[in-house]
């Protein structure tokens, strides 16, 4: 499958797989410098737009190295890019550390995973089938 990528800025970097076994395509900051203060969130530009085939979405996910080394992660993870969106891909980053973080142009800021989407038919129901769990959630099955 091919992913069409349009550079919206000449200096934008095309996403790529860092290794042959990588699931996600690395996305890059196109801005000269982005400063993120502690607990601040910012919208970071990639300078690219994509065209996904119908039946697929792109999920924007954090990079583990950025989270571990700088305390920065993708806020709405995973972010969803629908197949009919043609605007610039931007990434919402949040600095969870107690120090100011600088993201430089060309730095990898997130990864993009292309996944199939299943469409369902929504049917209103008066009752749902019983299960052992029922409405238990938020740790109801135990912590250990």
Swiss-Prot record:
Keywords: Hydrolase, Magnesium, Metal-binding, Nucleotide metabolism. SUPFAM superfamilies: dUTPase-like. Pathway: Pyrimidine metabolism; dUMP biosynthesis; dUMP from dCTP (dUTP route): step 2/2. InterPro entries: dUTPase (IPR008181), dUTPase-like (IPR029054), dUTPase-like_sf (IPR036157), dUTPase_trimeric (IPR033704). GO terms for biological process: dUMP biosynthetic process; dUTP catabolic process. Its EC number is 3.6.1.23. It comes from the Bacteria. Substrate binds at residues 63-65, 76, 80-82, 90. Pfam families: dUTPase. CDD domains: trimeric_dUTPase (cd07557). One of its GO terms (molecular function) is magnesium ion binding. The keyword Hydrolase applies. It catalyses: dUTP + H2O = dUMP + diphosphate + H(+). Its cofactor is Mg(2+). It is an enzyme of class 3 (hydrolase). This enzyme is involved in nucleotide metabolism: it produces dUMP, the immediate precursor of thymidine nucleotides and it decreases the intracellular concentration of dUTP so that uracil cannot be incorporated into DNA. NCBIfam families: dut, PRK00601.1. This is Deoxyuridine 5'-triphosphate nucleotidohydrolase. It comes from Hydrogenobaculum sp. (strain Y04AAS1).
């Amino acid at each position: 499958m091919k992913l069409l990528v349009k550079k919206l800025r000449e200096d934008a970097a095309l996403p790529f797989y860092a290794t042959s076994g990588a699931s996600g395509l690395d996305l890059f900051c196109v801005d000269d410098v982005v400063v993120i203060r502690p607990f601040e969130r910012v919208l970071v530009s990639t300078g690219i737009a994509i065209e996904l085939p119908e039946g697929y979405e792109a999920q924007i996910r954090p990079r583990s190295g950025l989270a571990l080394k700088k305390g920065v992660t993708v806020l709405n993870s995973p972010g969803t890019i629908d197949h009919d969106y043609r605007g610039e891909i931007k990434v919402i980053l949040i600095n969870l550390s107690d120090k100011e973080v600088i993201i430089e142009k060309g730095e990898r800021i997130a990864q993009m995973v292309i996944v199939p989407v299943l469409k369902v038919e929504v049917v209103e129901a008066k009752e749902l089938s019983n299960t052992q769990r029922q409405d238990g959630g938020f740790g109801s099955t135990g912590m250990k």
